[in-house]
């Protein structure tokens, strides 16, 4: 931690041209790839705030991730630069104060000791949890609305960091899932995916290309990385920030939160309310998305891709065949993994039934039934805040 603070002091001093001192370092955690530290600015010749957050990527770029994926640091740096350039009222992220690509260091605004969305879901106030979910969904929609025309800016920022061809990890994983899941279902669950169901899933890959509905996405949306500040929800952690079709982001909220991997469910109707909050923001940019005949099939396609990606990751472990492939966008439940996976397929069935698309309905029914011997029929508990609710509070 001392090394991280020393690097941050040196960076800020170099940027300001006068000595900056940092003190009282507090470890905020991080991941296997990075360390996150809160520091007090004890010697401040200019107008830096009283405290800052420093994120330091550990190891060399080719050691930062145990997979064959690209280095995540340039993606987070470009994401923070993109949002810092926006007007303050459009910025749903911390401000970036300094960035050192060589030492893989970011110095960010300290948003304070706020509750996270995860804290509200794990609390005991259903009304507060509902407000937090709807506020976060609305903030996510606004984040996408204000970045709708900025993919070129994001690409330019990545190129300045040496990234010539940027990738969306969900798109990579989805293409692999579309190729592999039919065989996985057949070999591990003895479920034969009908040709119509496979064709429907593969048609959803149209969302992975250059659609007209692309905007910034944090890559995986986790309640642990959503701070609830006095100015509204703020998002953290853009290690794989990217541009993708907005339906894919909305679907990840409705599942809910496959990147978090919590074995819990939302009250009946909450997913739809969250989608409506998100849509109220993006429809200002794309008015046609307020039309269910336009948005409905797109949400179904996005849900299909997410469920297939989650199946590729989780199914081998569910049936005792070892862990599936590691994926940036899918969290592994620590318990009730079969029930979590079954809940994703039920969500897909619900969406397909509403769109009167039969092929995914039949496949979802077969998968849910095949997961029962592994615990797929075990009821998932509600998030603690909703433990006394059967529907929206």
Protein language model features and the residues they cover:
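Conserved NTP-binding catalytic cores of kinases and kinase-like/nucleotidyltransferase enzymes
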Residues: 1-102, 195, 229-233, 352-393
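Active-site catalytic-loop/activation-segment of kinase and kinase-like phosphoryl-transfer enzymes
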Residues: 1-4, 155-205, 282, 346-356, ...
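AlphaC helix (C-helix) of the protein kinase catalytic domain N-lobe
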Residues: 76, 80-83, 140-143, 253
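Active-site activation/catalytic loop segments of kinase-like enzymes and analogous catalytic loops
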Residues: 248-287, 302-323
């Amino acid at each position: 931690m001392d090394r991280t603070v020393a690097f941050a002091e040196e960076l800020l001093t170099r940027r300001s041209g006068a000595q900056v001192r940092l003190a009282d370092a507090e470890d905020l955690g991080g991941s296997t790839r990075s360390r996150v530290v809160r520091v007090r600015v004890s010697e401040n010749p200019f107008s830096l705030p009283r405290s800052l957050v420093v994120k330091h990527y550990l190891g060399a770029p080719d050691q930062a991730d145990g997979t064959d994926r690209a280095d995540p640091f340039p993606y987070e740096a470009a994401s923070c630069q993109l949002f810092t350039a926006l007007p303050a009222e459009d910025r749903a992220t911390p401000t970036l104060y300094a960035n050192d690509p060589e030492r893989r260091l970011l110095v960010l605004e300290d948003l304070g000791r706020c509750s996270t969305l995860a804290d509200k879901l794990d609390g005991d106030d259903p009304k507060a949890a509902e407000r937090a979910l709807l506020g976060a969904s609305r903030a996510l929609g606004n984040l996408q609305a204000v970045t709708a025309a900025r993919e070129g800016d994001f690409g330019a920022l990545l190129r300045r960091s040496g990234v010539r061809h940027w990738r969306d990890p969900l798109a990579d994983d989805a293409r692999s899932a579309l190729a592999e899941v039919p065989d996985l279902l057949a070999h591990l669950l003895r479920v034969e995916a009908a040709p119509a169901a496979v064709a429907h899933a593969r048609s959803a890959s149209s969302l992975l290309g250059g659609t007209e509905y692309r905007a910034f996405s944090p890559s995986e949306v986790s309640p642990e990385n959503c701070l609830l500040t006095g100015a509204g929800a703020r998002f953290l952690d853009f290690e794989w920030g990217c541009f993708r079709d907005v339906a894919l982001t909305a679907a990840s909220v409705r599942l809910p939160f496959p990147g978090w991997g919590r074995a819990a469910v939302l009250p009946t109707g909450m997913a739809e309310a969250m989608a409506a909050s998100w849509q109220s923001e993006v429809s200002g940019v794309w008015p046609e998305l307020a039309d269910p005949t336009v948005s409905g099939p797109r949400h179904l396609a996005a849900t299909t891709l997410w469920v297939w990606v989650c199946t590729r990751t989780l199914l081998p472990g569910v049936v005792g065949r070892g862990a599936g492939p590691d994926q940036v966008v899918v969290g592994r439940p620590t318990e009730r993994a079969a029930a979590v996976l079954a809940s994703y397929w039920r969500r897909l069935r619900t969406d397909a039934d509403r769109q009167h698309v039969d092929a995914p309905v039949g496949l979802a029914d077969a998968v849910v039934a095949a997961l029962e011997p592994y615990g797929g029929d075990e009821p998932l508990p509600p998030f603690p805040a909703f433990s006394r609710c059967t529907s929206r509070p």
